[in-house]
A protein has these predicted regions:
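Conserved AdoMet/S-adenosylmethionine-binding subsite of the radical SAM
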Residues: 1-80, 84-87
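Serine/threonine-rich low-complexity intrinsically disordered regions
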Residues: 48, 103, 116-117
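A generic structural signal for well-ordered alpha-helical segments
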Residues: 32, 114-115
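Radical SAM enzyme core and accessory elements
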Residues: 116-124
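Short aromatic/hydrophobic-glycine micro-motifs
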Residues: 37, 90, 119-120
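A structural motif corresponding to the C-terminal lobe/cap of the Radical SAM core domain
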Residues: 54, 61-64, 70, 85-113
Length: 124
């Protein structure tokens, strides 16, 4: 089983969010599908970054192309670890920009658009 985090489906926006391309992540997802390795897709939902409907619909389309996805989880962005960043002297652009955790409505919307309830396969 592989837990695969897809933070953003759009490469340009992924780079803005993480500083890195998503190409390797998406290629790995396709490869894992080819070899039938079970995967749980996890998507950290960040307001004003990757919670827009068009991105969620695009991510859903990508996930549907894979035939090895056992679960899709929406993980709401939170600020519980902000103090760790501060202690390490690492800039947190999301905090600086006032990004807050998503509302229940946005979380529910993401779960609906990503059809998270449709993924109920279990490992044997």
């Amino acid at each position: 089983l592989v837990l695969l985090d897809i933070k953003h489906i759009n490469d340009e926006e992924h780079i803005k969010l993480t500083g890195r391309t998503n190409k390797n992540i998406l290629d790995l997802a396709k490869y894992l599908s080819e070899i039938k390795k079970p995967v749980w897709i996890r998507h950290v939902l960040v307001p004003k970054r990757n919670d827009y409907d068009n991105y969620l619909i695009e991510l859903d389309k990508f996930i549907k192309e894979l035939d090895n996805v056992y679960r899709v989880e929406v993980l709401p962005y939170h600020t519980l670890g902000v103090y760790k960043w501060q202690e390490l002297g690492i800039e947190n652009h999301l905090e600086e920009e006032g990004i807050k955790p998503p509302s229940k409505e946005r979380i529910d919307n993401a779960n609906e658009l990503l059809h998270t309830k449709s993924y109920t396969r279990y490992l044997k």
